[in-house]
Each structure stands twice: as C-alpha cells, then as structure tokens.
Amino acid sequence: MEEKDNLQLPENAFRELKDGEEYKPLMSPDKVYPEVNGWSVTWGIVMAVIFSAAAAYLGLKVGQVFEAAISIAIIAVGVSTATKRSKALGENVIIQSIGACSGAVVAGAIFTLPAIYILQAKYPEMTTSFMKIFMASALGGVLGILFLIPFRKYFVSDMHGKYPFPEATATTQVLVSGAKGGDQAKPLLIAGLVGGLYDFIVASLGWWNENFTSRVVSLGCDLADKAKLVFKVNTGAAVLGLGYIIGLKYAFFTCLGSLVVWWLIVPGMSVIFHDSVLSAWDPSIVKTVGAMSPEEIFRAYARSIGIGGIAMAGIIGIIKSWGIIKSAVGLAAKELKGKSDVDENVKRTQRDISFKIIAIGSLVTILITFLFFWFGVMDGNLLFAIIAILLVAAIAFLFTTVAANAIAIVGSNPVSGMTLMTLIFASVVMVAVGLKGPGGMLAALIMGGVVCTALSVAGSFITDLKIGYWLGTTPKKQEGWKFLGTLVSAATVGGVMMLLNETYGFASGSLAAPQANAMAAVIDPLMNGVGAPWVLYGIGAVIAIVLTYFKIPALAFALGMFIPLELNVPLLVGGAINWYVTSRSKDAKVNSERGEKGTLIASGFIAGGALMGVVSALLKFGGIEVSIADSWWVNPMSEVCSLLAYICLIGFFIRATKK
C-alpha cells in the first residue's frame, strides 16, 4: 500500500475511462493485503447485530430506516486508528461489508413482514413465528447476493464513471480519509461534525423544522387547500450532500419527476375528480378528492403512478440489460461444463466466487425456499408452492439489475415500490389459482418478504462492491462473508420485530411501520376480490415508455414520482452546488480540485447525518426526549428558522470548497 501521505484515490476514480485507460485502485492488484481475519469478521458481526437492532427499531417505531454503511465505516476507521492497526484499509472494507447487511435486511423485512401482525387484528387465524420471519429474510438476502454477483463486473467496472454511486462515494471517502489521517482527512472530519451537529439539532432537539414549505405564509396555505399546490424541501445536511454526489443531471430528472406529480398530477386530479370519492381499489378512502390535502392525494393515487413508472422502467432496464443477463448466465453455464478460465489468471481485484458455486448455490437456495413455501407457508399444497417459487425466483432475479441501477444513480433503492408491485402481481396470480383469504395474505406477504429482502440486499451489496473496486479489495472475500452478515442480520431483525410486537403491538398504532401498513392496505382488498389501481400503474408505465423514447432517464424520473417532494428538491439543490463549484473558475484544474473538495464535504455531511440518525434512534429507544418539535414545529417561524439555517449550511458548503 502507498504511504499515508500519498494515500488518495486516483484522478480517474469518478470519471469515465478513456480508450485504453485502466483504473488502478489504492491497493495494488498484484499484492496481498489483510482483509478477512478474526478482527474484521468479529467487528463485522458486532456491527451487523447493533445496526440491525437500531435500524429495525427506528424503522418500525418512527418509520425511518437509516443507511448503516457510512456509520459502520466511521466506526471501523475509529477502532482501527485507536488500536493503531497498520494496513487496516482492507479489513475496514470487510467490516463495513458484513455490517452493512443490517440496513438492507432490515429494510427488506420491515417493509412487508409486519403487515402479518397488522392483519392479525382483523384475521386472528393468520399466524407467524420467529422462524418464518428469519427464513423469509435470510433466504431473500442470500438470493439477492447470489443473483447480483454475476453483474458485479458490469456495474462496478464496465460502467465505471457512468454512475455516481453516491453512498459508495461517501463511504469510500470516509475509509480513505481515515487511512490518511492528519490534515488530509480534515475537510471530511469538519464537514462530518457540521453535518452531524446540524442534523442532530433537527432530529433530536427540534430547534428548527426539518422541512421548509410554502405553507409558511397564508397564501401558501390557500394554494395547498384550494389548488392542491405545495412546495416542500427537506433542509437536512445529509440529503444536501447526497444531491451533490448524485450531480445535477440525475438530480434534475429525479426532481422533475417529483414536480410533474406534485404540481401537475395532484392538482389536476383535484380539478377533474373534485367531488368524487375514488375508492375502487381502497375501500378505506371516504373523502372526496377535493377534500384531501396534496399529501393525501399523493399517497392515495399519485404515488401509484410512480410505482407503475418504476415497474416499467425496471422492465425496460431488464430488456436493455438482457445481453448482460444472457452473458452472465452463459458464463455460468460455460463454467459448469468445465470450460472456464483458470482462476489464477484473473487479477485479485477481479476475482469473484466461481459461477459454478453461484449456480449450485442459487439452485440449492431456491430449493430450500420452495420447501419453506410448501411446508411452512402453503400447508402442503404443492401447486401453490410451485407457483410461489417460480414467481419469487423470476421477479427477484430480473429486478436485481433494477435495484442495483437505482442505487448506482441516486443511492436510493425503490424496493418498497417494486415489492408493492410484486405483492399485487403475486396476489392476483395466487387468487387466480385458488389461494384466497387470510391464508393467501400470509403467503403473498411471505413471498413479498423474500423478494423485498433480495432486492434490498442486492442494491446494498453493489455499493459494497463498488467501494471494494475503488480501494482494491478482493471481491471474492466480500461476497463470501456477505452471507454471514445476512444471516446474523436476519436473526436480529426477526427477534426485534417479535419483541416490538409484544411490547407495543403493530395493530395498536404505537408503531408507525408505514410501508408495512401500506402493504396490508393493498393486499387485504386484493385477496378479498377488490382490484388494484391498474389505471394509475398504466399511466406511470406509459410515462416511462415515452421518457425512454426521448432518451430521458426513466428510472430517475419514476423515482422522483414515487419519493416525496421534500426529499427530491434538496437533491437538485445539492446538484446545483456541484455544478456551481466545478464550473465557476476558468481554470479546469481549480474546478477539479474544488469538485473533489466538495465530494469530501458532501461525504462528511452524509456520514455525520447517518451517525446522528443512530444517536437519535438510541435516545428515543432509551426514552430520552429532549426535542421541542411537537410544540415548536406547528409555529410557522420554525420553518423560517429552517430556511435560514439551510442558507447558512449551503453558504458553508460553497465557502469550504474554496479553502
């Protein structure tokens, strides 16, 4: 490894490579470095347990799941520095890779499986157990890893510089800056402190509102009530940093998708269906569209257009990626026949688990999943189990590339949207073959849990592999030990979920679990003969097709339609800062240096925000309530303070890139 003073990512780390140009990672492919050992595996398991428990609690109690990768990277760097371990970069990547299973498995599990407990209040005959939750999460996670590995080279190497990989960028900068030490890590450390303190003040103390909205003035309230027009921006440091790393291009199209939904579709629906109660696919809706708030119209109707857009963008992505899928399967078939290249001829940094093992592992996992469905979920009905495994395996495999693509573009996996589509499709198919009622709901939710975890883990894992590619770790080692992290995280989340149900009860309203509540609301009518919002899904699908025809990134646009407005606008603000700091000088070298400095600052904001998310969760878990948000945030002045703080944060960001 290079000396600490010279330790930095190559100049071509974040841009497309020229013809004949090669990317050379920090750790030379021709040398061997400490990666997998007792230290890294033990710390990885500890991180997986701690962050799985914290993420599960936070996600179920207050409806927010934080990304654990950056926080784990910071802790790994801190521990290795405190113990003065030399050449710890490879070890830290393994710690991060094992530990990061936590957020991915948690997201996959809590988006679907708590819906079983929620529906139990209405259908007492629906039962579940720790083993069912663990099996659904673990099998889904293992499938996600196995299905992603064949696409590693395409996403991290072949497409180098074409995708921003925001979370991977931030985590990599944390690991590199930690390995550097001294003044070279200073910008990231300062930005981490500023971003962390800023987000802690908002999340834990509530000194100013987390969002600035047009409702801050009476005219804005009137526009929201009558015209259903609203503007919202999340003023957090972490989301601003995310926007900077994504860049202006993808941030623009994501925000544009959001504005089309919030400023055209939502007001348009209010005008067209003002006095109508549109409850054909959701009997719980009793309000007319005109009586709803913009947020209610978005949740009840407009977001479904985004789901349709994501699904169609995913299908288009599968079609476009068909050559890659075909070559990956072909390579596996070739190796199974014993015609593969000798593993020793492949560079260490390009060495994956053999396709023979992946193919056999995939078949064995699918077989175990089939047996789990047959005896554990379908009560011995062979037909239902066969149809279930065919649906789960096909959807999980095909949408793996979509999940990885979304993470590579915006750092946000639309897993809840894809899972909702899976649930709807699975429910329609299972009803058609005769599986209805509570038994059908349980089966569809377990199937959804497997798919959701598979896609969540696949999306998260591509981040780990990109980090390894930039730094020069061995993919084969990351891949092998990822399975351990998945099993540990699945066991932890299963235990936490059952504990929270016993303590609070999912049906009591004490646990937010918004995604699981949405799944329960969708699946209940479907399994009882009520239709899905196919028209809205169809509109979203048509929009995605039109966008693709005009060469506009359909997935980024559809993500914008699905993700709330307040989380998309700051992406545009961050992207605009990126454009500004990298273009305001006539000297290209100065622009490049400022851009790199900005990436460090943005990474610090993301890292600080993520770490404070964990601290806030621990405070809430311990019953420590110091926030004044409940009483203060109803006052419009809290939003004025929010805007002023945001302007100061942006000013700090831009000024810091000049130093």
PLM ranges: what are they?
Residues 1-659:
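Alpha-helical multipass membrane-protein architecture
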